[in-house]
Amino acid sequence: MESRTVGVEHDVALHVGVAGDGPDVVVLTGGPGCVQYLERDNLSPPGHRAWYPESRGVGRSGGGPHDMERAIADLEAVRTALGVAQWLVLGHSWGGDLAVRYAVEHPDVVRGVIGIAGRGFQRDRHWSEAYEAGLGSEPVVDIEWVPEVNASLSDSFTRWIHEPDLWRRLADCPVPMRLIAAGDDIRPSWPLAQLAALVPHGSFSTVPGVPHNFWSTRPDVWVEAVTDALRDLTR
């Protein structure tokens, strides 16, 4: 895995890992506010050049708490600095939700979205109750995160999902989206299924028998799921 440093607005330097050759795909992690836990050679999608930015204020990147608008602006700054005209966007957990917003706001540069085990655009009470009831039953995966970045991005996410034109913009988004649930995730998957039915070129599927962080517990299954989705988006 090669490491690069990319300068973005406000004199902030972001860490970006890169591996492989082929069509470009940018990989976004969850949290929000987690380190770039998917930056591992054994998780890199075969036949693609994968970029692994670490978000502002986290890990090896400079800066601090920020909102979703800044997160997307950083992605665009990274893409431009790297000389990438278009790329596919792969996101896990909250990273999948960010990937969808990125596609809505920049459909000209996002070739397709793969969102795995996302939350979806909701703060639903029943969803939260199901999630909280399952806490403690998931395999423990130790991931570093920054609480202040988590809080600022979570607040920004809540504001965005309350925007009056959100569903109209999603329904008009031309970017193909593959939304994938983890079969043993404690997070209910119905928001992903609804989103796949709403966007013009969406699909929903479930990887059976794996938990939320199956990139860690079953990396072979993760790579297979990602490879299949990328193949579907690029054929």
Question: What are these language model-derived features?
Answer:
Residues 100-104, 113-138:
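Flexible "cap/lid" loop of the alpha/beta hydrolase fold
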Residues 186-191:
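Conserved alpha/beta-hydrolase "acid-adjacent" motif
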Residues 51-88, 224:
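Active-site loop/oxyanion-hole signature of alpha/beta-hydrolase fold enzymes
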Residues 91, 95, 99:
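Gly/Ala-rich beta-loop-alpha elbow adjacent to hydrolase catalytic centers
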Residues 173, 179-181:
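Short beta-strand/loop motif that positions the catalytic acidic residue
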Residues 8-62:
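Conserved HGGG/HGGXW glycine-rich cap/lid loop of the alpha/beta-hydrolase fold
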Residues 152-169:
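Active-site nucleophile elbow and catalytic-triad environment of alpha/beta-hydrolase enzymes
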